[in-house]
Amino acid sequence: MNNPKIFIPFYSMYGHIFTMVKAAAEGVKEAGGEPILKQVAELIPEADWDDNIKKVKEMMKDIPVADPRKALKGVDGIIVGVPTRYGNMSAQMRNFWDQTGGDWVKGTLIGKPAAVITSSATQHGGQETTIISTMITLLHHGCVLVGLPYSFKEQMTLDEITGGSPYGVSTIAGGMGERMPSNNELKMAKGLGRRLTEIAKKLSQ
């Protein structure tokens, strides 16, 4: 397979995950893949959006919303971008996956590589549990899980605050969302995109 299609469903309230999945999409392209970037449906009523949410929604207005009944068909790999909510995926992403039962029955994602990108307010705000709990859903779909090995030296840095672990890529947003992804975190996101695409090619042989 020369041009694997990598589906990147994401939810981003304040722009952190959007920034990270765009970097992952760049990595997919660098490895010869075709990134398919789509946001999942919002559940928060528009009347409750604050100015920051409105700003991010405007930034993402050209990104299509994924239809759970169609989005998984024909993809060769998947990178899920989801913020942490109490150590789990956000309700918006849960809502998406809970509507994919038809593809679960058909085995659409069996044997396809999958990875997770997340964000949290603090360094110990549930990043790894969110990644792992999201992976449980991906395992039920039959995916082959892809993490970030320590050959990616960016996750070993000690001279700055940074996300990233063997389980997947992450960023730290700050309590009020004031910290955007660092260059170090974006390198990891791009690297994950490359790695997953390369694995998708190998699995299709």
Where are these regions (language model features)?
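N-terminal beta1-alpha1-beta2 submodule of the flavodoxin-like/Rossmannoid cofactor-binding fold
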Residues: 1-108, 158, 172-205
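Short, glycine-/small-residue-rich phosphate/pyrophosphate-handling segment
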Residues: 110-162
